[in-house]
């Protein structure tokens, strides 16, 4: 398994698989090209035999340099349960730690039970939100009206 930083030219390759990897959910608009142009040093792709198996898009906060943020990550459905996601998170965390970050944050939708379980398994804590949905603390309207989100934080 190879891990490398992303490049601008990876945009089409990554965005072309989003809907397929997420079971038909329309997610391409959640990952604009700007991430591939401005956050290359903290975003990564895994591959095997020149085929992409996973990716992680993240960055160090400019507003709070001790905080890093994972914007989007994914693993090819045929390669799940092989620790690829964990490897991507580990490389990202080590990279931002070297830049002085002491915590990593990320968000997910309250309906994404797999993501919630995955992040808690990786040691992320759910931040106390503004309401509770199905026993999970969420921030109401975090990404706009009706777009509640679960916020995670992990001290590193």
UniProtKB/Swiss-Prot annotation:
Question: What does the record note on quaternary structure?
Answer: Homotetramer.
Annotated N-acetyltransferase domain residues: 1-156
List the disulfide bonds in this chain.
none
State the species of origin: Bacillus subtilis (strain 168)
Pfam families named among the record's database cross-references: Acetyltransf_1
Q: Under the GO molecular function aspect, what terms does this record hold?
A: acyltransferase activity, transferring groups other than amino-acyl groups
| Family annotation (SUPFAM superfamilies) | Acyl-CoA N-acyltransferases (Nat)
Q: What is this protein called?
A: Uncharacterized protein YqjY
What Gene3D superfamilies does the record point to? 3.40.630.30
Task: Name the gene.
Answer: yqjY
